[in-house]
Amino acid sequence: MVSDIAGLRVLVTAGASGIGLEMVRAFQAGGARVHYCDISDGEGPGTDLDGVTASRADVSDRGDVARLFAEVEKTLGGLDVLVNNAGIAGPTGRVEDIDPSDWDQTLNVNITGQFNCTRLAVPMLKRSSNASIVNLASLAGRLGFSMRTPYAASKWAVVGFTKSLAIELGEFGIRVNAILPGSVDGPRIQSVFANKAAALGKSYEEVEAAALAVTSLRKLIPPQHLAAMAVFLASAQGSSISGQALSIDGDAQMMV
């Protein structure tokens, strides 16, 4: 565990479950002070840990985000690390069958939500001597993803957003990187596989096997590995890394 994150003030979006909760736990274990938001009620998993607080916020709602950052300022007294983790899977289907409202919702959460949070975080991060933004993208932001066009489009946008921010904010010492997970073990990927199986008329086991077959390591990614990368990027050891799209995907060659 990286140990030089003690005292850092960290905001994790969508921190009540899955990857987000693992990030909350990892930062807290390293001695950081962590506030997380989630679309569910504020008092949730992780708030029993020392130095962890939470509130409700929908990152696609600018009013919610404004209230969130006011609370972060009040609770943490500033910000050193923003982890833009919030995201949704979006619809599964052929492009001609996708409801435009589902397209809009996917992009509103997955990329506009990151903009909403980053826009308010940057003035706070400029006051920090060790500032970092970690954006969650996806393997779908490096490869195409059949029948998941809204999701893939949103994650390609996250990578472009990340690289542009790194250039813009570098002069202020703010590092910006993206993590691109592959198939991460947990309820979300189970739902994705189930939806894909239904859309293709295949079994769940067939879809899962096909996904693993195109990765060299033939495995799902433990969410703790993503949390460890986020902590590293926020630490002194990661202080020379910016503008990168870092894949944690078991060496996936394609998405199926």
Residue ranges with predicted function:
Residues 4, 89-92, 143, 219, ...:
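Short C-terminal tail/terminal secondary-structure segment
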Residues 30-45:
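Conserved glycine-rich Rossmann-like NAD(P)H-binding loop of the short-chain dehydrogenase/reductase
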Residues 93-95, 99-107, 211:
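Substrate-binding pocket helix/loop in short-chain dehydrogenase/reductase
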Residues 118, 154, 162:
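Active-site helix of classical SDR
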Residues 138:
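Residue(s) in the substrate-gating loop at a strand-loop-helix junction
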Residues 170, 175, 241-243:
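Short, small/polar-rich loop/turn modules that mediate ligand/substrate recognition or access, typified
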Residues 178, 186, 202-237, 241, ...:
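C-terminal helical subdomain
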